[in-house]
Amino acid sequence: GLPLFVKPNASGSSFGVTKVKTREQLLPAVEAAFAESDHVLMEECIDGREISCGVMIAGGKEYLFPITELVCQSEFFDYKAKYQGFSKEITPADLDERTVEKVNAMTLAAYKKLNCRGVVRIDFIVRDGEPYFIEVNTIPGMSAHSIIPQQAAAMGMSMSELFDLIIEETSQAQP
């Protein structure tokens, strides 16, 4: 049913992502997504709070970054929200302990199941205290204003320390 999201399977910065509210918007949305990727996803639109959790395993140690809530002026965390100041990121997100525990457990499980390496960001929608997995960002932004560096700073980790961990972990031979 509608609304739903149409998005390219392999793209970044929300290029080609459309929130479809009417049947007439569906075909143009699919065409826009195919312009960015050979495969297109259609996802149920879940109303709730958009959050993101960074994670990495380095030197055998698990790093779960503080959760960030994404408060957007647009309908979702699109290009304008990400890069043109139409969003506010709140780190750490104001979530109850039970929700934080669920998100952290789901984040770590997804990281391991998908055999991720280095630092990734995993996005969720939280509705009525229940997190719904949305996607994995395997190449998250790393500018000083990006979410992962904000999360690292919130846990007392400098950009230099973060990059040292990433370089150390990703330079090791893959199993």
Model features per residue range: what roles?
Residues S13-S14, K88-T91, A144-I148:
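Short small-residue beta-strand/loop micro-motif enriched in glycine and branched aliphatics
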Residues G1-P3, E50-S52, R121, F133:
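Broad gene-expression machinery/nucleic-acid interaction feature
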Residues G1-F15, D38-D47:
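ATP-grasp fold ATP-binding core
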Residues E97-P175:
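ATP-dependent carboxylate activation and anion-phosphoryl transfer catalytic cores
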Residues K21-K102, V126, Y132:
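Phosphate-binding site of ATP-dependent enzymes
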